[in-house]
Amino acid sequence: MAEFEKSISFDGRDIRLKVGLLAPQAGGSVLIESGDTAVLVTATRSPGREGIDFLPLTVDYEERLYAAGRIPGGIMRREGRPPEKTILTSRLIDRPLRPLFPSWLRDDLQVVALTMSMDEQVPPDVLAVTGASIATLIAKIPFNGPMAAVRVGLVGDDFIINPTYAEIEAGDLDLVVAGSPHGVIMVEAGANQLPERDIIEAIDFGYEAVRDLIKAQLDLVAELGLEIVQEAPPEVDQTLENYIRDRASDEIKKILAQFELTKPERDAALDVVKDNIATAIAELPEEDPIRLAATANSKALGNTFKDITKYFMRRQIVEDNVRVDGRKLDQVRPVSSQVGVLPKRVHGSGLFNRGLTQVLSACTLGTPGDAQNLNDDLQTDQSKRYLHHYNFPPFSVGETKPLRAPGRREIGHGALAERAILPVLPPKEQFPYVIRVVSEVLSSNGSTSMGSVCGSTLALMDAGVPILKPVSGAAMGLIKEGDEVRVLTDIQGIEDFLGDMDFKVAGTDAGITALQMDMKISGLSLEVIAQAIHQAKDARLHILDKMLQTIDQPRTETSPYAPRLLTIKIDPDMIGLVIGPGGKTIKGITEETGAKIDIEDDGTVTISAVDENKAKRARNIVQGMTRKLNEGDVYAGRVTRIIPIGAFVEFLPGKEGMIHISQLADYRVGKVEDEVAVGDEVIVKVREIDNKGRINLTRLGIHPDQAAAAREAAAVNR
């Protein structure tokens, strides 16, 4: 393709699209730029594989540190395992892109987005989402697009499109909305307890901007002389489907109407029907068209049976307004919770149950040094003081699988629950702990990420974290058949799997803190989104009320096994003194006291130990080392060593001075040992600090009141 460049004036900024310049062998490629941010996005299609029953789409987003003018750390000096942010951005691109491919498409598709230059004024993620749509169109892949995404921020009372990092940090909203010509297709947001009306207005505001980007893509396709590919779906043999419908429809409908069945019981009953069909087909002659259709591939029978089950479940919801467990459309499953379910060695724990979904969250309080360093990110010098990790073991759905490292799904769910809690965490100045919550999904039947939000709240309150408000969450679903739309509250697994939407909303009684909407259809109107958001509020508040019956306030004390933190400020110029050459001094204090010391560049020193007395001892040493001395100050100290001309006294932790023999008494002293011995407590006064920083002490001219005060202060410091 010949080189082509198009500039779009968008919200006061230019977005530049360069086609045909880079990656000429990719199916489609575009370099999308705004400011000094540049993202190369490619889309490539390969022939499909036989026997698969899903779209093999892979989306990868990567960042190169050269984009920010940096060289990677480590021995290899090369980018290694992708940081969490790039995994989340890969998901951000995938989620609005995937629903727009035809359901019948089985070709291997790969979209790769590579940030090649980074401008701190222009985040690259939403550019990558829009670029993925453009690359797909250029690659002539069947696609129900175009699709585009923008970020919406809220600074003061004003919504802004594609805010800078600084504006995101200062604002109360960070919302990404993606859409197609058919409506909104994906929303993801973190918010500072914003009311529902503000979120709905922000989505509407963002979608208007998305429409402008969609129009620009259509113009680009026309200018390139391309057409949006709409391949006809392959013909589907209805033989097997008709056979199963004739023999199993009544039984499937009967099972779906048995509302008292649990998920395992319902699955087992449906499996019996499916197995009976399989047995009947196996008894047919080998040349029978039905048997041939069922054995065309190993998944033909199972997938056809699933599609028929899906049809009847959806019709039951649309026609009867009742769900497979008998609930009304807006009804939440039974909720229960507990705190303190694990021994006190665990700093805080919460168990949350909603229907057959069960999540156990455990909270650990750490020191500032436990914060997660994000230096592998293009945004440098960042760290996280709150971490949430989500685990989804196979036994949670009754399966046996190898245990592996967290995948994209686990990382995404963990990040969403983390985002939901961030706005209610106490300020660092009030609660300097680093906080980690791990949510273990012990049983899954839908909405485990929102179960993790609820479990996290319970665990934090049990750990004594003074959160501003408790947070709860609920997942909403959707069934859309033609013009008939049904919004479902608190979806369970089968409704998520067979439905058209998964809309997770978390927040407090004051407003929304996080939401994430994913679609399986090509777009949704704002009216339906608004209905889902308002319906989610009722569910959230119902769940929150149940949680508050378990624990209504954070505990007033942390676990006895949590570290005790003491924070002091020192002159930043004294940091080197405390650390010492090669860290010798600070290591010595740690070894002597058993406390851990963290020092920040501004002179904030955090000292931690499970035993508070150890922390106090380390604090006193640091304070003594960094305390400004004045001539005439009086201290109680101990003699540490003796030399012929005087005695050395440690009068503050880590700080020594010398008493010359002439200053030991108001009479002539023949030998130092005649007056003091090593280990003796003595009252001394700072006589002089010479130009080399040496401290000269005296025992002369000390008033009895000064001596008494010094002894009292020394007792406290010990």
Swiss-Prot record:
InterPro entries: ExoRNase_PH_dom1 (IPR001247), ExoRNase_PH_dom2 (IPR015847), ExoRNase_PH_dom2_sf (IPR036345), KH_dom (IPR004087), KH_dom_type_1 (IPR004088), KH_dom_type_1_sf (IPR036612), NA-bd_OB-fold (IPR012340), PNPase (IPR012162). GO terms for cellular component: cytosol. GO terms for biological process: mRNA catabolic process; RNA processing. It is found in: Cytoplasm. PANTHER family: POLYRIBONUCLEOTIDE NUCLEOTIDYLTRANSFERASE (PTHR11252), POLYRIBONUCLEOTIDE NUCLEOTIDYLTRANSFERASE 1, MITOCHONDRIAL (PTHR11252:SF0). HAMAP family: PNPase. This is Polyribonucleotide nucleotidyltransferase. The lineage of its organism: Bacteria, Bacillati, Cyanobacteriota, Cyanophyceae, Nostocales.
